[in-house]
Amino acid sequence: MEKIFYVRRNEFENSLCAVRTILAKYFGIQNPVILRTENGKPYLKDNAVYFSVTHTKDALFLAFCDENVGIDAEHTEKDVDFLPIIKRFSALERKEIVDKQAFLRNFTAKESAVKWLGGTLARDFRKLQFINGKISYGEIELPTKTVFIPLDNYIVAVTSERDFSNVETIIL
């Protein structure tokens, strides 16, 4: 039941409107009660469907699953000087980050893992490592898979215990 939605920012008033519309239209959940964890992660009161949302300047990306999920996206043309940033990454990660695209894969993988954890960037991002396609929190490898989905000029990372390799992608 894994689904990814790609929505232009101007299609909905805000991301919560997009979530409510998608839940009603694609999952038959009318008037969902959406709560937030202490760290701000939105969730359904009855956990019938798990979801994660990420924003870019021009788009929303939403992941839905019957298990916990995290999503992040970045525009591949984003102008970013990644060399000063990766100085804070582990030596093994720095070896893998050979160009901007590798940096964006690493960054989106880790941010989607933070969302899967229900954590915060400030607390958890630096504790995560993305090496050889696997995410670790400190010394512990997470029981997740991170899949990258190219959509237009975006790199979209989805982290879940489910395999999103053959995910249905819906463009609204």
Predicted regions and their residues:
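Core catalytic alpha/beta fold that binds nucleotide/phospho-ligands
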Residues: 1-172
